[in-house]
Amino acid sequence: MAKIVVTGGAALHGEVSISGAKNAVLPILCATLLADEPVEITNVPHLHDVVTTVKLLGELGAKVTIDQGTLSRGSAIVVDPRPVNQHVAPYELVKTMRASILVLGPLLARFGAAEVSLPGGCAIGSRPVDQHIKGLQALGAEIVVENGFIKASAKRLKGGHFTFDMVSVTGTENVLMGAVLAEGTTVLDNCAMEPEVTDLAHCLIALGAKIEGLGTARLVIEGVERLSGGRHEVLPDRIETGTFLVAAAMTGGKVTVNRARPNTMDAVLSKLVEAGAKIETTDDSITLDMQGRRPKAVNLTTAPYPAFPTDMQAQFMALNCVADGVGVINETIFENRFMHVNELLRLGADIQVEGHTAIVRGSEHLSGAPVMATDLRASASLILAGLMASGDTTIDRIYHLDRGYENIEEKLSSLGATIRRVP
């Protein structure tokens, strides 16, 4: 099983380009099932979860064409949903990736039936699917959960009013996709406002959907008879953007991230400024300059967008490990999302966990050690800590990393990091 070895000590300098957003491309690929003509998706990152989604679309009968036949950086994927002849998403694929549940709404809306295995994929909490089920039931779907499958049917979904009990990104996306082909008008309240949800809505609109309220907690969808083909470019990944900016801040370097979307980064950028970074932005780039200084510890609480993202919590914990002062991190989104703490402790970090709160006392010195990635963002935090540790840090189970970061070792190497992948 492959590992990544990081040798610490180098400040990062240079420029790096950001890939398409993992959390946008997965629902957008699933949304192609709603169309009755081919759909082209561009700026697709080469990630394991994208490969899994492409396999799932193929299992359902869709014809998927990837430029040059393989997924390379910034690929284009054309999905032709016309040959779809299955409505069952099998356990073998769904168990490896929770986002597989995002075919539920499209299959139900387009073909009147869907069977999706209950999801697996992440070890960071229960992430209940009840909001998906309740939302689609509010649109007239008949749904039962049996034998490990969500089984849904409806002749045609009908517009309705549904308020999410809790903010759910994938729940919002699934019900939104179901509503675009429903008969009549649907009003969804307490929707997730994440940029990736808005990007999905922009894609649906490009295919002919009628959606109002983008970027707000209320979405109003006027159902249409059909969605046509079209083209959509996936927005840049704000979590990858934040990860590289934190790496620059931790190492006292200066890095410019290009092909970024600064207007989706307010919460993260404000915390980096609080940590002592000098930041300049353009419409599509962010430059962070630490001017050789050690970062200051920051306090943060994760919450739904536009507040601080849970997907950046582990990276900022790594920053606090080497910062000047004490930082308090409150995790309010997922339980069990401090699994990286024990691995950071192996590098010499000083962290105390009390329930959903971690108290991090900054240290001027970390030392390299073998560590194990436990989930996607935890694996990134271990790489960041490794950049600051003396000697080598060897990170095992990096298949987590490949689910959400495209060529991270190449990109970090281009900025001056000593990092390599080994068998």
Curated annotation (Swiss-Prot):
It is an enzyme of class 2 (transferase). One of its GO terms (biological process) is peptidoglycan biosynthetic process. The keyword S-adenosyl-L-methionine does not apply. The keyword Aminoacyl-tRNA synthetase does not apply. The active site is at residue 122. CDD domains: UdpNAET. Pathway: Cell wall biogenesis; peptidoglycan biosynthesis. Its EC number is 2.5.1.7. Belongs to the EPSP synthase family. MurA subfamily. Cell wall formation. Adds enolpyruvyl to UDP-N-acetylglucosamine. This is UDP-N-acetylglucosamine 1-carboxyvinyltransferase. It comes from Stenotrophomonas maltophilia (strain K279a). The gene is murA.
